[in-house]
Every structure is written in structure tokens, then in C-alpha cells.
Amino acid sequence: ETRCGTMVASTSLLHSEVQEAVKDLMAAEGWDLEIVEFTDYVQPNEVVESGDVDANYFQHVNYLNSYNEEKGTHLAIAGNIHYEPRGLYPGKQSDLAAITDGAEIAVPNDTTNCARALLLLEAEGLIKLDPEAGITATENDIVENPHNIKLVPLAAEQVARTLEDVDFGVINGNYAMEAGLTSADAVALESADSEAIQQYVNVVAVKEGNENNEGVQALVKILKSDEIKDFINENYKGSVVPYDGE
């Protein structure tokens, strides 16, 4: 017996693949999950705000908060599902403990990913940032650089292709996957409890007041189930990681 229909909006192939895996598990519990795909990052929030769609699964916490602030919308988090860790990958060097003076590290040149790269380098003890910088850190916020590391800013999708020309590179999970790299190849990864992951964990979002909607709760429960965690781990090899927190 089908208890109810739940509509969920998504954008990327990753989110759609995960939701297709969820669909059968939802059906087994009597839910008809309808997936509505979009090609931009605005419409999925518009249809949730309007009530046309129950939930969406495509964005991280930081984007949701910024969207609410900019648009005056009332989106809320129903569940934290996964994160896509940035990794520090070896190029001409592979041992962080023996990093040479003046080593070149390729980093994404966009604001968000550059900040995450800098926070990762700080977590590994390679640089020290102004403590006030947080997830808005830029190269100007580096207050200690004992190894005289030289940052090489590149478009995020280009970093993996330039590893042979630099000593290390900080690569987004999706681009690492496209380059045939896995998390096991990285010499360092963002940790689940890092400041960056708390802001960039991907969530199921609903309109405020619908967090406890029965269908939404069923969706979140299944997205956080062992079956879906196994699906993510097997298919994305550490480039996408299930979030174990609440």
C-alpha cells in the first residue's frame, strides 16, 4: 500500500543517482518518491518555498543560509546527508613531513574552494591563518608560512590535470573522481568535524515547519540508512562520504 507521495528536487548526477537508489527503499516502506530534476541552483529552492515540492537534496548548509538571506525565503534543514571532502593530492612530492621550502601547491581559484583549501593546509600544519578568517579565508589571511609555500591558483577543474607540474594540489572530490583518483590517493582529507564540513555538508531542505513531515522524515531516514551509506561508499570511493552526525 502506498501511503503518500513525496516529491524531491535535485540538480547534479550525484544527487539523482543517490535518490534513484533511495526510490526502491522508499517504495518498500510504502512511499512513492517522485524525483524532479533541475539544471540550476535556484528553481529547486523556489519549488520548495512555494510548496510545490516537499523537499530538495542538492545544496550545502552555507548555500542554503545565503539563499535564505538573499531571497528572504524560509528553507530549513531536515537532515545532513553527505559531504564531498577536498583532498590534498601528491604531485612532484608525496611526503608532507618532508615538504621542501618553496613548494608549490595548486589550489582552486574560486572563493569558496580556495578557503577550504587553505583550511586544509592549516589543518595539516603547513600554514597558519588569521583565526578570524574561517571559511572566508584568502591568501591574505596567511599569518605564518614556515615552508614558504607558493600557492598556484587554478580553476578547480584544472588542478588534477596539473599535478605533475606542482608539488601538491587540493582537489574537489568530483574532479578527483573524474581524474581517476580516490581518497586513498590523497595525503590529507578534510575531516568530518572540520569547520568547512560543518558548513558544506549536503542537506535535505524543506520549507520551515515541514521538518517533521512524515514523508520527509522517511526520506531522511533512508538517505542515512546503512544501505545508502554502502551505496555511496561503493560508488564514490571516498570522494563522497556519508555524514554520520545529526
Spans of model-derived segments:
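Ligand-binding "clamshell"
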Residues: 66-78, 91-94, 165, 170, ...
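Pocket-flanking alpha-helical
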Residues: 41-72, 94, 178-180
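Short helix-initiation/N-cap motifs at beta->coil->alpha
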Residues: 35-46, 134-161
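Periplasmic-binding protein-like
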Residues: 114-122, 223-243
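Alpha-to-beta junction loops
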Residues: 49-59, 103, 126, 147-150, ...
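A conserved helix-loop-strand patch within extracytoplasmic ligand-binding domains
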Residues: 78-127, 229
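Short, polar/charged alpha-helical segment
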Residues: 5-32
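A bilobed periplasmic-binding-protein/Venus flytrap-type ligand-binding module shared by bacterial periplasmic
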Residues: 85-96, 200-213
